[in-house]
Curated annotation (Swiss-Prot):
NCBIfam families: rpmJ_bact. Keywords: Ribonucleoprotein, Ribosomal protein. This is Large ribosomal subunit protein bL36. Belongs to the bacterial ribosomal protein bL36 family. One of its GO terms (cellular component) is ribonucleoprotein complex. PANTHER family: 50S RIBOSOMAL PROTEIN L36, CHLOROPLASTIC, LARGE RIBOSOMAL SUBUNIT PROTEIN BL36C. Pfam families: Ribosomal_L36. The gene is rpmJ. The lineage of its organism: Bacteria, Pseudomonadati, Myxococcota, Myxococcia, Myxococcales. One of its GO terms (biological process) is translation. InterPro entries: Ribosomal_bL36, Ribosomal_bL36_sp. One of its GO terms (molecular function) is structural constituent of ribosome.
Length: 38
């Protein structure tokens, strides 16, 4: 999980999700693409 100030989709499979006020990116294809804003 990468924690970044600005999260962007890395590939086409990445999805932007908002959980408890934080923006997250999850990727079923490549788990390395997981990100969280913070």
């Amino acid at each position: 999980m990468k924690v970044r100030a600005s999260v962007k989709k890395i590939c086409d499979k990445c999805k932007v999700i908002k959980r408890k006020g934080t923006v997250r990116i999850i990727c079923p294809a490549n788990p390395r693409h997981k990100q969280r804003q913070g």
